[in-house]
């Protein structure tokens, strides 16, 4: 959305930094980066950690945090800066939390659903709703809960780019087993260390 990259932008499967023990970071599911060039779309399709971190570094964690909290509804879960009772400081404004999901408190399923819906709603963030309306016994509207019309993306093309990448994920990427016969699907997988948690967030555009 910032005009910095597109799905076809070439990036490299390589570590960005070294960790405290001198090991390259990030790794790809415990494997060393290959150093090969690939498109951002290919990185998303194959869930390559190094590509996610390279792109986040291009965008900057601060800009990404601001976008998520101000335009995609994640303001209640993401931690800007928190000082704990023992004096330690925590923040989600960094590469690992925002590029790889290593968040301080995590996010909710509802927030993820709201964020993903932006990709199939022409870039508009409509929020999330538990109900649309309530009728009385005669069919009169008692309560109505209309969707929001806040702009998630400045450029609607960004939503289309992301949707195209996520359609590749379900077509032939890490979520290729989630296709539904006769229905278009798109989504993104995510795992924690040793596959303790396995996530999939998807849409049917």
Regions inferred by a protein language model and the residue ranges of each:
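Surface-exposed patches in mature extracellular/periplasmic domains of secreted proteins
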Residues: 8-9, 76-93, 97, 126-131, ...
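Secondary-structure capping and boundary motifs in well-ordered enzyme cores
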Residues: 32, 36, 40, 44, ...
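A penicillin-recognizing enzyme superfamily signal
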Residues: 6-7, 105-205
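A short secondary-structure junction motif
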Residues: 18, 47, 71-76, 122, ...
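Structured DNA-binding interfaces in DNA transaction proteins
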Residues: 20, 101, 128
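Extended, hydrophobic alpha-helical segments in both membrane/secreted and soluble proteins
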Residues: 1-2, 7, 51-52, 64, ...
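Conserved catalytic neighborhood of penicillin-recognizing serine enzymes
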Residues: 5-64, 95, 137-168
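Mid-domain, small-residue-enriched loop/turn segments at the edges of structured enzyme/sensor domains
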Residues: 24-28, 60-112
């Amino acid at each position: 959305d910032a005009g910095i990259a597109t799905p076809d932008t070439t990036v490299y499967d390589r570590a960005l930094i070294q960790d405290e023990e001198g090991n390259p970071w990030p790794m790809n599911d415990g494997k060393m980066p290959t150093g090969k060039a690939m498109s951002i779309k290919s990185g998303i399709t194959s869930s390559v950690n190094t590509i996610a971190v390279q792109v986040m570094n291009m965008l900057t964690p601060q800009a990404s945090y601001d976008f998520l909290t101000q335009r995609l509804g994640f303001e209640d879960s993401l931690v800007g800066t928190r000082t704990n009772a023992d004096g330690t400081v925590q923040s989600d404004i960094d590469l690992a939390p925002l590029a790889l999901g290593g968040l301080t408190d995590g996010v909710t399923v509802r927030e993820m659903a709201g964020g993903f819906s932006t990709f199939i709603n022409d870039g508009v963030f409509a929020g999330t709703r538990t109900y649309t309306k309530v009728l009385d016994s005669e069919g009169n509207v008692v309560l109505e809960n209309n969707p929001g019309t806040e702009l998630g993306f400045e450029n609607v093309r960004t939503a289309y780019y992301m949707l195209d990448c996520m359609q590749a994920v379900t077509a032939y990427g890490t979520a290729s087993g989630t296709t539904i016969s006769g229905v278009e699907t798109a989504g993104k997988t995510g795992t924690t260390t040793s596959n303790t948690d396995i996530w999939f967030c998807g849409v049917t555009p």
